[in-house]
Curated annotation (Swiss-Prot):
Induction: By stress conditions e.g. heat shock.
Subunit note: Forms a cylinder of 14 subunits composed of two heptameric rings stacked back-to-back. Interacts with the co-chaperonin GroES.
Species this chain originates from: Synechocystis sp. (strain ATCC 27184 / PCC 6803 / Kazusa)
Enzyme class: isomerase
Keyword annotations: ATP-binding, Chaperone, Cytoplasm, Isomerase, Nucleotide-binding, Stress response
Protein name as catalogued: Chaperonin GroEL 1
Positions annotated to bind ATP: T29, L30, G31, P32, D86, G87, T88, T89, T90, G413, N479, A480, A481, D495
Gene3D superfamilies listed in its UniProt record: GroEL (3.50.7.10), GroEL-like equatorial domain (1.10.560.10), TCP-1-like chaperonin intermediate domain (3.30.260.10)
SUPFAM superfamilies xrefs: GroEL apical domain-like, GroEL equatorial domain-like, GroEL-intermediate domain like
EC number from the UniProt entry: 5.6.1.7
Length: 541
């Protein structure tokens, strides 16, 4: 296909146009008075949401060059979502603001490479400052505040996540499920999560979230490598007759056997998924035994005199639900409390008896996985559209609370970044010079952008409010919900430090790359072929 090649300022301006479109669509959702965005779906009803990354993923422009700009800024949001699970809108607004400021300087003749160096140095300084100002999350009240802010000022959701963390521990698993009623409920069930995902992406059942979800499945657990599909055929036939989904947990699966499973899955013969067994060596065998205890199944192992080809449905485990992503598998089990309890006691005795600190640590991990359980939040809503929106908000809230536990909290509502702008200016003026100084000052001018946008979405003058906030103490910011200046930490308006840090780092990274762009190569749009003309010939009139 022929390519279009665009140079210099024209290239950067085309990228900027794409960024403007995406940033505006995402920025309307920022803050307590942010609005929703409606996404048209080819199949099913439209989606009404308030989630930055979901909106960013939907935007595709007709112009190839502008679309490249959209993809670049989407990357900042996507990376922030991967690392921190929240803060995608902040990352988008920041990246857009840094690019806008930077392009003015590049157009005026500044050297983009030196500017980028200045932006990078400013980012390192700010990351260190965010860490200094972060305060550890002390109690469940602080966790509830983080969850409530991230879920769009929903205090009930914040409290529910705090309760879930109390029950399953801060490292515990909190999973989301679509409820059957109008109310959102919390349920603590037996279950565990281990860090192995699906072997093949063809096992995915929810393409949008790239997850495989199996309801009421049977579970085949084996410690051997599956080389031949013939070994699996008897058990596959028995499960297919029952009409239940099947999860296979094995050391590995050879390509030929895996291909057969994938074909059966795609043809709808059997809803099947496969994951590799967690751990290695003797620990793998013990973890498989834990999973077998939890699910009421048996480990098909030659050590126990059991062979795959002679396995029956009775040796399979069962669960209420299994969620598999590319990185981990969550099993929500039911009704094996006595067996799980005695298994936990056995592990506790092993912990007491062992002298090795490494073994102790690994046994503690196993105990936490087995005894901790899984907190299931059943999301309730009146309509499917509201359900999807609530689910996305809850997902953000869970990720934000986990990020807060990891790296602490800072004043929210864009306050931290706005207060750091004058500190950055002072540091840069004393430590940098020439165009590197200009690069750092570009970041300083862009830092209040999230606060300005939050104020504008609340119908206020963003520029005036950000200047007033800068004059006040570090913890004091603007509460856009009540339209007043308050101590953000005391008012419970907080952001996880990890989210603020990730948003800033990813925004600065993408902005630096855009500013140093001198040429873009994109596909030329194909011209529509003219339809065939009518056939010629003699006509009788």
């Amino acid at each position: 296909m022929a390519k279009s090649i665009i140079y210099n300022d024209e290239a950067r301006r085309a990228l900027e146009r794409g960024m403007d479109i995406l940033a505006e669509a995402v920025a309307v959702t920022l803050g307590p008075k942010g609005r929703n965005v409606v996404l048209e779906k080819k199949f099913g009803s439209p989606q009404i949401i308030n989630d930055g990354i979901t909106i960013a993923k939907e935007i595709e422009l007709e112009d190839h060059v502008e679309n490249t700009g959209v993809s670049l800024i989407r990357q900042a949001a996507s990376k922030t979502n991967d690392v921190a699970g929240d803060g995608t809108t902040t990352a988008t607004v920041l990246a857009h603001a840094i690019v806008k400021e930077g392009l003015r300087n590049v157009a005026a003749g500044a050297n983009p490479i030196s500017l980028k160096r200045g932006i990078d140095k400013a980012t390192d300084f700010l990351v260190a400052r965010i860490k200094e100002h972060a305060q550890p999350v002390g109690d469940s009240k602080a966790i509830a505040q983080v969850g409530a802010i991230s879920a769009g000022n929903d205090e009930e959701v914040g409290q529910m996540i705090a309760n879930a963390m109390d029950k399953v521990g801060q490292e515990g698993v909190i999973s989301l499920e679509e409820g059957k009623s109008m109310t959102t409920e919390l349920e603590i069930t037996e279950g565990m999560r281990f860090d192995k995902g699906y072997i093949s992406p063809y096992f995915v059942t929810d393409a949008e979230r790239m997850e495989a979800v199996l309801e009421d499945p049977r579970i085949l657990i084996t410690d051997k490598k599956i080389n031949l599909v013939q070994d699996l055929v008897p058990i596959l036939e028995q499960v297919a007759r029952q009409g239940k989904p099947l999860l296979i947990i094995a050391e590995d699966i050879e390509k030929e056997a895996l291909a057969t499973l994938v074909v059966n899955r795609l043809r709808g013969v059997l809803n099947v998924a496969a994951v590799k067994a967690p751990g290695f060596g003797d620990r793998r065998k013990q973890m498989l035994e834990d999973i077998a205890t939890l699910t009421g199944g048996q480990v098909i192992s030659e050590d126990a005199g059991l062979k795959l080809e002679s396995a029956t449905v009775d040796s399979l485990g069962s669960a209420r639900r299994i969620n598999i992503t590319k990185d981990n598998t969550t099993i929500v089990a039911e009704g094996n409390e006595a067996a799980v309890k005695s298994r936990c006691e056995q592990i506790r005795r092993q912990i007491e008896e062992t002298d090795s600190s490494y073994d102790k640590e690994k046994l503690q991990e196993r105990l936490a996985k087995l005894a901790g359980g899984v907190a299931v939040i059943k999301v309730g809503a009146a309509t499917e559209t509201e359900m999807k929106d609530r689910k996305l908000r809850l997902e953000d809230a869970i990720n934000a609370t986990k990020a807060a536990v990891e790296e602490g909290i800072v004043p929210g509502g864009g306050t931290t970044l706005a207060h750091l702008a004058p500190q950055l200016e002072d540091w840069a003026t004393g430590n940098l010079k020439d165009e590197e100084l200009t690069g750092a000052l570009i970041v300083a001018r862009a830092l209040p952008a999230p606060l300005k946008r939050i104020a504008e979405n609340a119908g206020q003058n963003g520029a005036v409010i950000s200047e007033r906030v800068k004059e006040k103490e570090f913890n004091v910011g603007y509460n856009a919900a009540s339209l007043e200046y308050v101590d953000m930490l005391a008012a419970g308006i907080v952001d996880p430090a990890k989210v603020t840090r990730s948003a800033l780092q990813n925004a600065a990274s993408i902005a630096g790359m855009v500013l140093t762009t001198e040429c873009i190569v994109v596909d030329k749009p194909e011209k529509e072929k003219a339809p065939a003309g009518a056939p010629g010939g003699d006509f009788d009139y």
